[in-house]
């Protein structure tokens, strides 16, 4: 059965690595130009002054109470050009108490102290954050190209990233959402590469990127639990593949003799050797996985200068019901104060955990109503973020994503109908298996489910912005409609 493919000789230019590299540079330069221009045209958002003041406080005082609900990586970077350019200070609005959010008042004080010049300071702070979006585009390109085995696939994913309105909107801002999308995608990409070919070098790169992702947004704390689960699933699929391969008798060689003591002993020795080798490999991978998680934790603490790291759990004052055990969110307390767990040191920076607690409090009780399609209400909708993505992404991108699922279904059918064929999706990228798609989809789907399950309030589609990068890597599969048509022989 022949499937419709577009056979255009011009598409072979993407087989040329130099031509592909030139196109990547052009797309990234165009993307950077759009972000740089937008940064000069749009006024600061409500959150940006607080983020910038937080970064300035990190550098000046080495403290992280301001805007603690977000880790400091984006703050650090955005503040650098402002420090170099010089600014007027006003720290009088700072205060700290359980549940305190001084960043908004302090952001207003910063604008008041710097007057009209604050617009220029926000502009250069925004420009400093542009590389985050460029890094995200590169990870899109590399993962798509490696997954689908095609330069064109990588270019499709990069194109979608570079001209995605939501990425363009947040990539120009002094906020952590685009950086979280980029580094979260990069961390999952490097972890997938480690799963395919484990090694200490790759494990080190994964651990470092995990730490950077954790320093962009607390949402990625889930990776500490997801990755061990994904690794176990990966091992299980490898085990099944070995069993399937061992049950297929060779067709071009005589059946080995199993009679006699010598033959039986030799077979047993081979089987034992394979078992020992496999066990050793699993133990090595497990050690590397532990190293990945520990290195990620180390980089996270390093980003905070180990500020309050390993504080005992009972020494915190929380405000969310999940951590206080109280009936009302916002009331200070600590449910672990009198428990055995309270004596355990927390391996996270103090302000990081306080930020998680404060964000959780907002999810439990939020004073402002939510809005969707002409309706205001206290609380939210489980489909709010799905609806937001549907109306905020271009129809062209949605059509390409729909074509991606069609492509996958077509080649799934094709691989299943091939005699003796394993469930391999793409003939020219025969290494792609269901576990690769699991590695691509597990993190974004988990993020989408977790955010959608917080029904106390629904605000800002940016909370699920990282989903787009993974979706556009998946969209690279559509490159296979542009392969040269194969002519049947015989």
Summary of predicted features, one role per range:
Residues 25, 225-228, 289-298, 414, ...:
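Signature aromatic-anchored transmembrane alpha helix within multi-pass, membrane-resident enzymes
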Residues 187-203, 232-238, 242, 247:
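Membrane-interface transmembrane helices that cradle and orient dolichyl/undecaprenyl
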Residues 127-147, 186, 190, 406-413:
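Transmembrane-helix motifs of polytopic, lipid-linked glycan transferases
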Residues 393-430, 487-488:
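Hydrophobic, aromatic-rich transmembrane alpha-helices
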Residues 20-25, 92-108, 140-163, 196-205, ...:
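Transmembrane-helix signature of polytopic, membrane-embedded enzymes
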Residues 65-128, 312-379:
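Interfacial juxtamembrane loops and adjacent helix segments
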Residues 27-28, 157-162, 189, 210, ...:
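Short helix- or helix-capping micro-motifs
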Residues 139-143, 179-196, 209-210, 470-477:
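Specific aromatic-rich, kink-prone transmembrane helix
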């Amino acid at each position: 059965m022949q499937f419709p493919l577009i056979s255009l000789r011009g598409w072979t230019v993407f087989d040329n690595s130099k031509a592909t590299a030139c196109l990547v540079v052009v797309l990234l330069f165009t993307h950077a130009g759009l972000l740089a221009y937008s940064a000069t045209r749009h006024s600061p958002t409500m959150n940006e002054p607080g983020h910038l003041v937080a970064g300035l406080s990190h550098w000046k005082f080495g403290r992280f109470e301001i805007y603690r609900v977000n880790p400091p990586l984006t703050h650090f970077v955005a503040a650098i050009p402002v420090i170099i350019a010089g600014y007027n200070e006003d720290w009088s609005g700072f205060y700290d108490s359980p549940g305190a959010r001084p960043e908004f008042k302090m952001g207003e004080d910063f604008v008041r102290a710097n007057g009209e010049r604050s617009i220029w300071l926000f502009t250069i702070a925004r420009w400093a954050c542009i590389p985050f979006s460029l890094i995200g585009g590169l990870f899109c390109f590399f993962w798509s190209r490696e997954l689908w085995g095609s330069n064109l696939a990588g270019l499709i994913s990069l194109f979608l990233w570079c001209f995605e309105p939501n990425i363009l909107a947040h990539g120009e801002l002094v906020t952590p959402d685009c950086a979280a999308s980029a580094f979260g995608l990069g961390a999952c990409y490097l972890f997938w590469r480690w799963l395919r070919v484990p090694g200490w070098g790759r494990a080190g790169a994964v651990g470092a990127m995990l730490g950077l992702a954790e320093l962009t947004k607390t949402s990625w704390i889930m990776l500490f639990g997801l990755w061990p689960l994904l690794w176990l699933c990966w091992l299980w699929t490898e085990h099944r593949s070995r069993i399937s391969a061992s049950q297929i008798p060779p067709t071009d060689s005589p059946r080995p003799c199993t009679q006699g003591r010598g033959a039986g002993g030799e077979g047993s020795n081979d089987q034992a050797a394979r078992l020992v080798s496999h066990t050793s490999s699993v133990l090595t991978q497990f050690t590397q996985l532990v190293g990945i998680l520990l290195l990620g934790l180390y980089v996270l603490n390093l980003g905070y200068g180990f500020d309050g790291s390993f504080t005992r759990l009972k020494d915190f004052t929380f405000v969310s019901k999940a951590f206080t055990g109280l009936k009302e969110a916002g009331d200070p307390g600590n449910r672990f104060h009198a428990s055995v767990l309270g004596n355990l040191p927390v391996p996270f920076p103090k302000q990081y955990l306080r930020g998680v607690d404060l964000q959780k409090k907002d999810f439990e009780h939020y004073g402002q109503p939510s809005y969707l399609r002409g309706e205001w209400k206290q609380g939210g909708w489980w489909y709010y973020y799905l609806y937001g993505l549907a109306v905020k992404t271009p129809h062209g991108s949605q059509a390409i994503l729909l074509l991606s699922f069609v492509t996958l279904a077509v080649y799934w059918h094709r691989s299943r109908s091939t005699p003796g064929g394993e469930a391999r999706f793409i003939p020219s990228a025969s290494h792609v298996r269901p576990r690769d798609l699991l590695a691509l989809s597990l993190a974004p789907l988990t993020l989408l489910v977790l955010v959608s399950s917080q029904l106390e309030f629904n605000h800002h589609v940016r909370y699920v912005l990282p989903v787009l990068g993974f979706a556009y890597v998946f969209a690279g599969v559509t490159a296979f409609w542009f392969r040269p048509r194969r002519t049947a022989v015989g």
